From Swiss-Prot:
Keywords: ATP synthesis, ATP-binding, Cell membrane, CF(1), Hydrogen ion transport, Ion transport, Membrane, Nucleotide-binding, Translocase, Transport. GO terms for molecular function: ATP binding; ATP hydrolysis activity; proton-transporting ATP synthase activity, rotational mechanism. PANTHER family: ATP SYNTHASE (PTHR15184), ATP SYNTHASE SUBUNIT BETA, MITOCHONDRIAL (PTHR15184:SF71). Produces ATP from ADP in the presence of a proton gradient across the membrane. The catalytic sites are hosted primarily by the beta subunits. This is ATP synthase subunit beta. PROSITE patterns: ATPASE_ALPHA_BETA. It is a peripheral membrane protein. SUPFAM superfamilies: C-terminal domain of alpha and beta subunits of F1 ATP synthase, N-terminal domain of alpha and beta subunits of F1 ATP synthase, P-loop containing nucleoside triphosphate hydrolases. It comes from the Bacteria. It catalyses: ATP + H2O + 4 H(+)(in) = ADP + phosphate + 5 H(+)(out).
């Protein structure tokens, strides 16, 4: 027996629907509103009174009017999962939007699911090797961890994301899910075609709810991407989940909260900010079967790190990767700031004494170089003591050795991409710190993989 209701009020994306008081739909149930030539999906958010519910539309409410029929589907929004989703582009409801033909999947999961229980979770901290030297050495990622990716426009966030997708696919046989939350459609379009060109698309599922979508879609699209990731994790895969941008998830939640009439909290955000963020982040974790490692681009409004949105996000992050414009100006890519980026995994009990010592010494030498730069700018390098000259020489080599050619950027740079295992990364930097390569020109260190590549380059330069 189908449970039908009638639309009694529409205010933008908010729809009030009257049902029989005996058959009120459950919270978070999906409703189908028949709008003639199309069906609009809405999600139940509140029960108001004995026989009325308030729902938020997941699609445009254009063309809806009072008196239209709404069908209670009896379950929450469900999206397709499984290997069929790879290489395809979906919206919040799991419908393909890439125009690449029909789509069928054997299974679908509801987007609202409980986080794994304590017994199911894997608590052993394990390094997630990315093959990117600057990340693996100074701010390593945790398997099943959450990483914040900070950076302005044009500093290389997208290329870094693509390289991570490429590396997890090729080196770990893992899969990726990219979730575009409230960002520009043009950027999503560019990313889709760049992924197609660089060959990583068939190992990735993409889910988009962009800036032009209603707030309900932007609020729930992160859950759609997460649900697809959870399926792969439960099948024993290591999954990389990208969320771009986590701030827009909070922003959409704030819009919905205001539309539902909740009293705003600090800086106008929703009073349920911490709860909503926790419900999303707690589902991103490793279990005994597989892992979801999440990389989340974080927009910081007005560069204010104390704003409730980024501040709530920070509480959940295990590592931060900060991209710096000053480093792009030096022509060093990836433009990761080695001193600003950090990780909870940089602990001798997890990564081992040798790796920890090398990382700390690299940070110290770069910090000292930063302090000396003012003196060099005013007096010149010749005025430095012999010890400081040595520090500057090694720091400049380290700075250049932190650069690396990326596989996904081969067609632009003409350089073959390099994947560097952690062991090789630590050994290379240890040798530079010990002064074994003080006689090699610093230009030989730029855009190389291992220290052997540097020595080869130096030999070629001598010829």
């Amino acid at each position: 027996m189908s449970n039908l209701g009638k639309v009694i009020q529409i205010i933008g994306p908010i729809i009030d629907i009257k049902f029989d008081s005996e058959n009120l739909p459950d919270l978070f149930n999906a409703l189908e509103i028949n709008a003639g030539d199309r069906k609009v999906i809405a999600e139940v958010e509140q029960h108001i009174g004995d026989d009325t519910i308030r729902a938020i539309a997941m699609e445009d409410t254009e063309g809806l009017k009072r008196g239209m029929e709404a069908l209670d589907t009896g379950k929450s929004v469900s999206v397709p999962v499984g290997k069929e989703v790879l290489g395809r582009l979906f919206n919040v409801l799991g419908k393909p939007i890439d125009g690449a033909g029909e789509f069928t999947s054997e299974e679908s999961y509801p987007i609202h699911r409980p986080a794994p229980s304590f017994e199911e979770q894997s608590v052993e901290p394990e390094i997630f090797e990315t093959g990117i030297k600057v990340i693996d050495l100074l701010a390593p990622y945790q398997k099943g961890g959450k990483i914040g990716l900070f950076g302005g426009a044009g500093v290389g966030k997208t290329v870094l994301i693509q390289e991570l997708i490429n590396n997890i696919a090729k080196e770990h046989g893992g899969l990726s899910v990219f979730t575009g939350v409230g960002e520009r459609t043009r950027e999503g379009n560019d990313l889709y075609y760049e992924m197609k060109e660089s060959g990583v698309l068939e190992k990735t599922a993409l889910v988009f709810g962009q800036m032009n979508e209603p707030p309900g879609a932007r609020m729930r699209v992160a859950l759609t991407g997460l649900t697809m990731s959870e399926y792969f994790r439960d099948q024993g895969q290591d999954v990389l989940l990208f969320i771009d941008n986590i701030f827009r998830f909070t922003q959409a939640g704030s819009e919905v909260s205001a539309l539902l009439g909740r009293i705003p909290s600090a800086v106008g955000y929703q009073p349920t900010l911490a709860t909503e963020m926790g419900a999303l982040q707690e589902r991103i974790t490793s279990t005994k079967n597989g892992s979801i490692t999440s990389v989340q681009a974080v927009y910081v409004p007005a560069d204010d790190l104390t704003d409730p949105a980024p501040a709530t996000t920070f509480a959940h992050l295990d590592a931060t990767t900060v991209l710096s414009r000053a480093i792009t100006e030096l022509g060093i890519y990836p433009a990761v700031d080695p001193l600003e980026s950090s990780s909870r995994m940089l602990d001798p009990r997890i990564i081992g004494e040798e790796h920890y010592e090398v990382a700390i010494k690299v940070k110290n030498i770069l910090e000292r170089y930063r302090e000396l730069q003012d003196i060099i700018a005013i007096l010149g390098i010749d005025e430095l003591s012999e010890e400081d000259k040595l520090v500057v020489g090694r720091a400049r080599k380290i700075q250049r050795f932190l650069s690396q050619p990326f596989t996904v950027a081969e067609q632009f740079t003409g350089m073959q991409g390099k994947y560097v295992p952690i062991k090789e990364t630590v050994r290379g930097f240890k040798e530079i710190l010990e002064g074994k390569h003080d006689n090699i020109p610093e230009s030989a260190f730029l855009f190389q993989g291992t220290i052997e590549d540097v020595l080869k380059k130096a030999q070629q330069m001598e010829i």
